Amino acid sequence: MRSVIEPDHSIQLNEAIYCYDICTNDFAYNLIAVAFRKHLSLLLVGLPEESGEFGYTRLQDMDLGEKEQRSVSALAFSPDTSLNCTPNNVTLCAANGSQLKLYRTDLGQFTSLQVLRGHGDYVNDVSWVCDGELLASVSDDFTCRFWTTTGGGENVITFGLSSAGMSVKSHPEDPNKVLVAEKKGIIHLYNVTLKQTVISVESPKFPLMSADWAHSNRLFITSLAGGDVVTWDLNRPYVPADVKQVHEDCGRVVRFAPGSSEMVIAMVIGLTLKVFAAKSTVPLLEASLKSYGGMAWHQRLPYISAVSDRKLLFWKVQMK
């Protein structure tokens, strides 16, 4: 175990970062989307384990529109995003106020924008589900909505919630199920094909601010609610497998590490990044941030990243 204050690598940008996403696809896993006040930027990062040194390239900027007053709250790359084809194929959804903005680009000649409207309030999270056939979104309007993105784009399913929707997640091994987390602490696994809830669990505390679904084991889900990180094993869903009290503050985001054999969880509490092995109360890593603009794991290499004002910071985590 080690505690780290300073990041191993950083990207200095010219404006404050509102949120970002690192692509998880096999053919674009170093692609990063960054949201600023009025535009998005696509970056390609190089990590020392692959390219010998750390660096990045700014590939393209995309305008959010002058009229938009709300900042981007979530970003998600579609599963068919690839930099290993000709032409390149990048599809990115940005949650911008109550709208979903769908950008498609080949990073060269062609860029298009499609706007999906239907939510009545701020969208908190977006995720591609059903192997990329549908886009899912959750909002302060107490709904989870599913959208087709071909043609004009259509809201084909609406799943009513009892409080604001905070997180929506898919799983590569179970593409027809979606994790939907509500602010009052209820987490549903929803079968999109059957249009019904399969199982629900409830956090002992609320408000719930974030939830995630472990890619390394689809039976494990976690939430950050009321200052606790609560993890469930869905084989025994009625009692949490682990409750970790991390702070009186309710926190901001929680994420499982994608490739670790043991459950490793990262979170941002206030302006502190913490990484824990699931059963441990001693952090593997702890670092201070100047502002909050998101947090994400790299899909292939053991790096956790987070925003601090105008910087995107990377820490290497020692994991099993």
Swiss-Prot record:
Report each WD repeat as a residue range: 67-113, 118-157, 160-200, 203-242
Q: Which UniProt keywords apply?
A: mRNA transport, Nuclear pore complex, Nucleus, Protein transport, Repeat, Translocation, Transport, WD repeat
| Protein location | Nucleus, Nuclear pore complex
One Gene Ontology term from the biological process aspect of the record: protein transport
Organism, as annotated:
Drosophila melanogaster (Fruit fly)
The UniProt entry lists the main location of this chain as nucleus
Descriptive protein name: Nucleoporin Nup37
SMART domains xrefs: WD40 (SM00320)
| Signal peptide bounds | none
The UniProt function text for this chain reads: As part of the nuclear pore complex (NPC), has a role in its assembly and function.
- List, alphabetically, the GO terms of the cellular component aspect: nuclear pore outer ring
Q: Which phenotype arises from disrupting this gene?
A: (Microbial infection) After infection with E.chaffeensis, results in reduced bacterial replication rate and increased survival.
